[in-house]
Curated annotation (Swiss-Prot):
It comes from Escherichia coli (strain K12). It comes from the Bacteria. The keyword Signal applies. Pfam families: DUF1131. This is Uncharacterized protein YfeY. Keywords: Signal.
Length: 191
């Protein structure tokens, strides 16, 4: 009984003491985080980044758990100026995060260390995932108009962008024969 009273008295002190150490990366103490990245693209989002994550630097940094650096920017989309974040891993862009209505709406993953939960990652060949583009793929738009975007099988939120060599007319999709040698260059999650 005495140890129970002591524990009840010590518990609030321990809990308040931990709250003052918010800068400590506690997830690093978990053994399953010791060996490699646990960040994956899933139906819910990318790692802890989901559709409910506010499009704010601190919220994104908290969800990334200190594993990356953030860089913010502005761009125009459909005639509006919008904010976006680039997630940096060293000197390379690992992810681009876009949003609307105050929360994350799209995450473009460019880092081969962040796979989809199905195992697909940057560099996976088209032929490993699809036998033909028809019914699965379409030309990518915007800055990526030389690429092809394909919906991930069984997914409502994930698609893969493939790129490779092709010298055909602009605006047309490459043939299935050409696409079989293309590789995933971007994994896209949309809300």
């Amino acid at each position: 009984m005495k140890s129970l009273r002591l524990m009840l008295c010590a518990m609030p002190l321990m809990l308040t003491g931990c709250s003052t150490m918010s800068s400590v990366n506690w997830s690093a103490a978990n053994p399953w985080n010791w060996f490699g990245s646990s960040t994956k693209v899933s139906e819910q989002g990318v790692g802890e980044l989901t559709a409910s994550t506010p499009l704010q630097e601190q919220a994104i940094a908290d969800a990334l758990d200190g594993d990356y650096r953030l860089r913010s920017g502005m761009k125009t989309a459909n005639g509006n100026v919008v904010r976006f974040f680039e997630v940096m891993k060293g000197d390379n862009v690992a992810m681009v995060i876009n949003g609307d209505q105050g929360t994350i709406s799209r995450i473009d993953v460019l880092d081969s260390d962040i796979p989809a939960d199905t195992g697909v990652k940057i560099g996976t060949p088209f032929s490993d995932l699809y036998s033909k583009a028809f019914g699965n793929c379409q030309k990518a738009d915007g800055d990526d108009n030389r690429a092809v975007e394909c919906k991930a099988e069984g997914s409502q939120h994930i698609s893969y962008q493939f790129s490779g060599e092709w010298r055909g007319p602009e605006g047309l999709m490459p043939s299935d024969d050409t696409l079989k040698n293309w590789k995933v260059s971007k994994i896209i999650w949309r809300r």
